[in-house]
Amino acid sequence: MADLNNNLLSPNGKNIALTKTENFQSNPIQISKIIELGDIKVGYLMYNQFTLGFDDDLNEVFSNLKAEGISELVLDLRYNGGGLVSSAINLSVMITGQFDNEKFASFIYNQKVMNVYNSDEELKSRLNLNFTNQLGDGSTINSLNLNKVYIITSNRSASASELVINGLSPYIDVVQVGDNTYGKNVGGPAAVYDYIDNEGNKNPEHTYAIKPITFYIANGDGFYEYA
């Protein structure tokens, strides 16, 4: 350690040992609490990323909010730059719950790709992302059945965060508070890593990957022009 005096660092003889935590993953559920305003119970949730592996934790948070009988929800997405589309849908269902199997969002590709999808009913159904009442593991989603949600945003709120706002807008009253969001209304498949061969061997000389942008993502009304 060192002391700072007059913008100069001088060793102070103190040593601190740090232990590295393997495979550490930050919990995106930053804050969850209930604010009582007279007779009204308001739930407040700061959620910072739509991350794999935290949908169960988020579902438990909504179970607690539901048990406490909140009637209003403030969702803080100021620091949420996006993540998994599936998690964005799950969060949206936790807020609502009354729109099971309705269209939440849909993919819009270029015309050649759309022609392929539209040529077959089964393929065409893959373009739509619907509200569901279950998580991926089959467990029931805890829903608040709200008709209004307040969402706090910043210019760092992007992608899946914007999908929640846009996807819910045709169904409930979404009150956006704060700055305009980033404006990422597109997506694509997982990055193409050509340095990994079919046997899983890596070529260390390959240092670039391709992440193609292949689709817009629209809400149930077909709107996606918010970039």
Indicate residue ranges for each PLM-predicted region.
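C-terminal, low-ordered peptide segments at domain boundaries
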Residues: 1-70
